[in-house]
Amino acid sequence: MELKGVQPSNGSPNGNGNGATNAASTEKTDAEKPTAERTNWGNGLEFLMSCISVSVGLGNVWRFPFTAYENGGGAFLIPYIIVLFLIGKPMYYLEMIMGQFTSQGTVKIWSVVPGFVGVGYGQAFGTICIISYYSSLLALTLYYLFVSFQSELPWSYCRDEWTNCVNSRPEEYVDNLLTGVSLANESARNLSGIGLVANNETEKLQSSSELYFLNVVIKEKLDISDGVGDPDWKLTLALFVAWVVIFLVIMRGVKSSGKAAYFLALFPYVVLFVLLIRAVTLEGARDGILFFLEPQWGELLNPTVWKEAVVQCFFSLAVGSGPIIMFASYNRFDHGIYRDAMIVTTLDTLTSLLGGITIFAILGNLAHNLQIENIRDVVRSGTGLAFISYPDAISKFQAVPQLFSVLFFFMLFVLGIGSIVALQSTIVTIICDQFKGWKYWKVALTTSVCGFLMGLVYVTPGGQWILTLVDFYGGTYVVFILAIFELAGIVWVYGLQNFCDDIEFMCNRRVSLYWRVCWSFFTPVMMIIIFIYSMATIEPIKYSELYFPEAANVAGWLLFAIGAAQFPLWGLWYASRHPQGTYWKSLKASLKPSDRWGPANPETRREWVIFKNQKAPQRATQKDTSKLGFFWRKIANFCGSNK
């Protein structure tokens, strides 16, 4: 950026020249006053490893395989890859740019459009909801990890008090099969476990791994109308250990989390490849892999499949919740984020495929051992897949199942830590950006204690009900709708050309047509259509095929309303605190960049002001003949943009 020799001018440019003020003025704006230097990553590799650790997580190993299977198998890869290129990659790159350009967290970046600051607060709310239950999954993972060191895996055999139980040891299944007990078809399956048919009547048998999870680990309640119960002390202890680890990783900010990122990002691949090699050598693995990859082409015409592809993409890449913005804010201003964005989004997809092949190879072996023709009968979703199907399959390994169990659950724990560290750091960064004098480690400690206390509700007998409710209302939909507003605020209000100019200044490269078309049209339009479809087809949520009490659904919608309402409420608050005559003028003014928008470093900011002022005359003479561009510009102008 060869701009050093040009005399700077003060102001906050909007891209049309109005931000340029008298160059001779010696008075500095608030944005130009020296600010405390923001901590940077030790090197660019730490940033890359951190992004990998958050984006390549539990969603790749235990959510993607089942989601793909339920939505067309191999055919699901087509809408998923399309969604990745039209929504996932553009949103990921956009959030990286926003964080690095301003060196600010999820809330402070909205100096670009102050009236949209509620997007940042709403995303923080959604992130807190996700953190609250994510840590409970770590507690379950730790519990299984600890008990895997026993001489015999505790879920591989039945207890005396369990009726209709079949040991998860392979020989026990063979014994049952030899006595003439055959597995029921899919219509005989129910929430309680594997349906078995004997003497022309359906006898409900459950594997010991399922009964162990339901009766010993979570002590499941099937009715929460009278409350969720008390926290289990073993899971509470595991939850405490998980939060201690989280705090130790984030206590020194990127100085500590950046070093941990190498292990958090790379170790899961070591274990995943070990499990892959073992899985593909098992009998029945080929059938499981083909079952996973076999396309069901008719599903491509199902709108639900496309909706699930978007949800999976958001969940997997962690866009819309703040971690990517937060991580990028600790980069040097000239860091090459384009390369990192391409690496992470591509690696994320490949890891999902790798995880799917590994998991379905194991499930194929499980079906082979059970002599089940339809692998659907051994597939579970969500928590059941991680803590029932996997342990059940591992217990059937002939050689050292304890070793593979330890490796598997330690891998899950590391994947979970990588994700929750990013989410927790997002909240800590938001607080520290707001209150500059607060010590980072003290904020990290306080938020970790709060996270532990919130997590207690999920380690109760009714905890899985609450997890399902919070994830559905407070996580998925809040994050999704605010991501739409996030994109609209940058592209339609601040202006696509303004944003592209900022990227050109920071990265010293022009923005390609692909990014422009995605940001201005394909990404927002697809997201809006899918959100409307999701709302129009929404159904009451269920847990284990049981509907939630009416009061729980009311609480869920209230949770969603609180998260979504952050956007308009904070916008109105900002307009009232910065009056510009009439209230309508104040609202329009809140849609223009504030003096604080721009690079954090004063010298870099002055260079950016010059660059923008040089660009303004060029853009004033350009004529956009695109009807689409004209349409979006009219919308932006109506909203008060100076595009």
UniProtKB/Swiss-Prot annotation:
Residues 27-36 have a biased composition (Basic and acidic residues). Glycans are attached at residues 185, 190, 200. Residues 1-38 are annotated as: Disordered. Keywords: Amino-acid transport, Glycoprotein, Ion transport, Membrane, Sodium, Sodium transport, Symport, Transmembrane, Transmembrane helix, Transport. The chain crosses the membrane at residues 41-61, 74-94, 111-131, 231-251, 260-280, 309-329, 343-363, 403-423, 449-469, 476-496, 518-538, 554-574. CDD domains: SLC6sbd (cd10324). Unusual broad substrate spectrum amino acid:sodium cotransporter that promotes absorption of the D isomers of essential amino acids. Neutral amino acids are the preferred substrates, especially methionine and phenylalanine. Belongs to the sodium:neurotransmitter symporter (SNF) (TC 2.A.22) family. This is Sodium-dependent nutrient amino acid transporter 1. The lineage of its organism: Eukaryota, Metazoa, Ecdysozoa, Arthropoda, Hexapoda. The gene is NAAT1.
